[in-house]
């Protein structure tokens, strides 16, 4: 796909916000019991409940492979691209913060609805079909010998509409992976609108992982043992401010990098260390990744293969509308074997949009970097 060349101005990337009360857009839900190790509970004005959990009693350490794990508080090194940003203030911070030695865990919401198992848009071995309930507009960068050491992404945030809020989801994320089939290992992070899982229609930051191709390992956020959080400020699952069509644009900045000393994969949000996926829970990705993917995914719970759903991806507008109207991902960067940050050119990526009349993608060259515009209104 030939890139289009133009120049545009980035709107302010200020992340402090006051989100309206979530109740008006919530589905029937109740809160789970507080997790073990809770030393303090904070309730936001929007109804959000966050438990401050002893860092050594967090869910990760219930994983059988982490019984004797030594907590790593900071990465031993990081690539030079990780920058410094203003911290995102979350609504519950108005009523307190978690003390040092604890981590904030968003109280799990129980909706009584099944959580859909994720799928992987494996462009390398088995590209997604247009006849599935998962639809994608995704690009991938392949790197031989499973030696990629990380990737970056700055993701435009939106609040897409879902045809069936009780079952559909829409997300934008970065996938870092190695292996295939039952040996597929993934590290995933981005934003998602999924009322059936979170209890409301707000875009929320999420993480995900699997060590066996989504068969029996892995989960969203901290709902199962795996990801080790070290940061006492950011609550995984936090609500994010969505962009305005033709107006203010908001972004999620994230970086995932492997620590060469320990093999742990570290997550940074807006330049701040949040925690890591331990090397010991994986098998294929312990030394590096072979693929990085960026883009959007929707799930159509109606079982029509995505062709008859109006569930939106990204902003709900096609990528041809451009900045301020179509959703984008920038900072399309990887960390190579030697720890160097590389910025692949448009022709270095493989992309796929199985239902391009519903969701599509295109590259556009900004004044200083490449942008991936993606998404769409669904199949009308």
Curated annotation (Swiss-Prot):
Which cellular components does GO assign to this protein? extracellular region
Task: Spell out how it gets used.
Answer: In the proteomics field, can be used for directed protein digestion for mass spectrometric analysis. For example, can be used to study post-translational modifications in the N-terminal tails of histones. In a single digest, efficiently cleaves histones, after 'Pro-32' for histone H4 and after 'Pro-38' in histone H3, which generates the N-terminal tails 1-32 and 1-38, respectively. This generates convenient peptide lengths for retention and dispersion of modified H3 and H4 peptides and allows the simultaneous analysis of co-occurring post-translational modifications in these N-terminal tails.
Alphabetized UniProt keyword annotations: Disulfide bond, Glycoprotein, Hydrolase, Protease, Secreted, Signal, Zymogen
Active site positions, chain numbering: 188, 297
Top-level taxon in the UniProt lineage:
Eukaryota
Temperature-activity note from the record:
Optimum temperature is between 37-50 degrees Celsius.
- Mutating residue 175 to A: effect? Abolishes activity
Instruction: Provide the E.C. number(s) assigned to this enzyme.
Output: 3.4.21.26
The signal peptide here is 1-24
Which reaction is catalysed here? Hydrolysis of Pro-|-Xaa >> Ala-|-Xaa in oligopeptides
| Hydrolase among keywords | yes
Q: Which residues form the propeptide?
A: 25-128
Task: Tell me the compartments it is located in.
Answer: Secreted
What Gene Ontology terms describe what this protein does at the molecular function level? endopeptidase activity; oligopeptidase activity
The impact of changing residue 136 to A is: Significant loss of activity
| Annotated control of activity | Weakly inhibited by the aspartic protease inhibitor pepstatin. Weakly inhibited by pepstatin A (IC(50) of 140 uM) and 1,2-epoxy-3-(p-nitrophenoxy)propane (EPNP) (IC(50) of 480 uM). Activity is not affected by the POP inhibitor Z-Pro-prolinal inhibitor or the denaturant urea.
Q: How does activity depend on pH?
A: Optimum pH is 2.5. At pH 4.5, the enzyme retains approximately 50% of its activity but it is almost completely inactivated at pH 8. Optimum pH is 3 with fluorescent bovine serum albumin (BSA) as substrate.
What GO biological process, any one, is recorded here?
Answer: proteolysis
Protein name as annotated: Protein neprosin
């Amino acid at each position: 796909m030939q890139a289009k060349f133009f120049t545009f101005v980035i709107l302010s990337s200020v992340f402090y916000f006051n989100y309206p009360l979530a109740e008006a857009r919530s589905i029937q839900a109740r809160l789970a019991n507080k997790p073990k190790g809770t030393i303090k509970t904070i309730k936001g004005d929007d109804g959000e409940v966050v438990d401050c959990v002893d860092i050594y009693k967090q869910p990760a350490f219930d994983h059988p492979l982490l019984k004797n794990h030594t907590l790593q508080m900071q990465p031993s090194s990081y690539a030079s691209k990780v920058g410094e940003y203003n911290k995102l203030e979350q609504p519950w911070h108005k009523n307190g913060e978690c003390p040092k030695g604890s981590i904030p865990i968003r109280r799990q919401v129980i909706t009584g609805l099944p959580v859909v198992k994720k799928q992987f848009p494996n462009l390398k071995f088995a590209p997604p079909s247009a006849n599935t309930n998962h639809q994608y507009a995704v690009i991938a960068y392949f790197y031989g010998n499973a030696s990629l050491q990380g990737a970056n992404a700055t993701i435009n945030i939106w609040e897409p509409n879902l045809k069936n809020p009780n079952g559909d989801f829409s997300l934008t994320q970065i996938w870092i992976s190695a292996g295939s089939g039952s040996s597929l290992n993934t590290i995933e992070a981005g934003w998602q609108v999924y009322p059936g899982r979170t209890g409301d229609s707000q875009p929320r930051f999420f993480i995900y992982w699997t060590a066996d191709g989504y068969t029996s390992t892995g989960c969203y956020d901290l709902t199962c043992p795996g990801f080790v959080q070290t940061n006492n400020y950011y609550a995984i699952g936090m609500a994010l401010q969505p962009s305005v069509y033709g107006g203010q644009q908001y972004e999620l900045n994230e970086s995932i990098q492997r620590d060469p000393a320990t093999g742990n994969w570290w997550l940074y949000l807006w330049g701040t260390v949040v925690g890591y996926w331990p090397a010991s829970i994986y098998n294929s990705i312990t030394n590096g990744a072979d693929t990085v993917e960026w883009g959007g995914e929707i799930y159509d719970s109606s079982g029509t293969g995505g062709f008859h759903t109006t569930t939106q991806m990204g902003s709900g507008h096609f990528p041809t509308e451009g900045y301020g109207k179509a959703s984008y991902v920038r900072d399309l960067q990887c960390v190579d074997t030697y720890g160097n940050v590389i910025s692949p050119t448009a022709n270095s990526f493989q992309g796929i949009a199985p239902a391009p009349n519903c969701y599509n993608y295109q590259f556009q060259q900004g004044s200083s970097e490449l942008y991936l515009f993606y998404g769409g209104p669904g199949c009308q």
